[in-house]
């Protein structure tokens, strides 16, 4: 028996933070799940849809003992492909309760059209229908009450019991996200954060942060995988690649007008060569014809002389 609960949030980052923190398995649709937050944010910024609802959520729960964590996550990804094929979706599988369940976070903006996901009755009915179909295809039980609108509990919003601790960590995450977007290497990244009052400490592959109004350092790993050194390096490499691509494109930009002109010139040359070849063949044919006529005339003359010679002998 699989049930689904629908919700939405004005903070996609909070929904992902909560879901990722407890995930046993995770996967992504139209995005790298390890960088889901930044990918979601970039798409919303691209279409100017950063206000209002940032993400829609589906909690997909299964009957105890029916699925493994891996199967649970795969079923969540299948549901995402059915209900939001053109959206970026992150699927996180939790196993901390007696029943395994997925937290499916859907970015609000359609990658192709830029339109926002509509969580109306028609869409909710679609979620229930597709979820039931997937369960039947995999031989899982189906409940008659497969869907219910839900509101996030405090924990599901990603707000931990110590609200103050969550507030400063969430603010720190936002500052780090901003620094990643506006810098191209670790040096400028650190300088950007220090200007915002956040200390940065690197030790090998470990990075830690300390806001000026806090008395303790927090590791990037504690904040989430997107705040670790490797993730930041990856983001900077992506920025550098994007900056190089226009230069590369300009360097090797094709002048299609010149190509078309050159193609026409080649066609004209082929026509001229064909005409020259035809004329040459015509000349050869005319020459051969004249030679044949001359040979026939000479042969005819020889025959006349031979006949006259024979007449003289007979006399």
From Swiss-Prot:
Pfam families in the record: Relaxase (PF03432)
InterPro entries in the cross-refs: Endonuclease_MobA/VirD2
Segments for region (Disordered): 263-315
The entry's keywords: Plasmid
Domain of life: Bacteria
Function: This protein is probably required for relaxation complex formation and plasmid mobilization by conjugative plasmids.
Protein name: Protein rlx
Biological source species: Staphylococcus aureus
Gene designation per UniProt: rlx
